[in-house]
Amino acid sequence: MKVVAPGAYNDAEAVSTALKLGNAVVLNLAATPDALAKRILDFSFGVASALDANVECVGNKVFALTRIDELTEAERSYLRTQGII
């Protein structure tokens, strides 16, 4: 699982790279300015669509992108302990 908390548009590339490798991605946009967050979401949703990945909102401005059904309970637990969700 890769957690991406983008500070710039170029950081969105980490989403596509991780998904192509089959890793789950948690996209944490909580600290990302709204205009940038929208651009990154548009890009990430496009990547998810192209790769037949699932997108789930797991928290306030936090999204899970997976090429499997959903995050495992262990992954969710880790995100809770990190204060992401």
Q: How does the language model describe each region?
A:
Residues 1-25, 30, 41-85:
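Positively charged, small/polar-rich N-terminal and surface patches that mediate targeting and assembly
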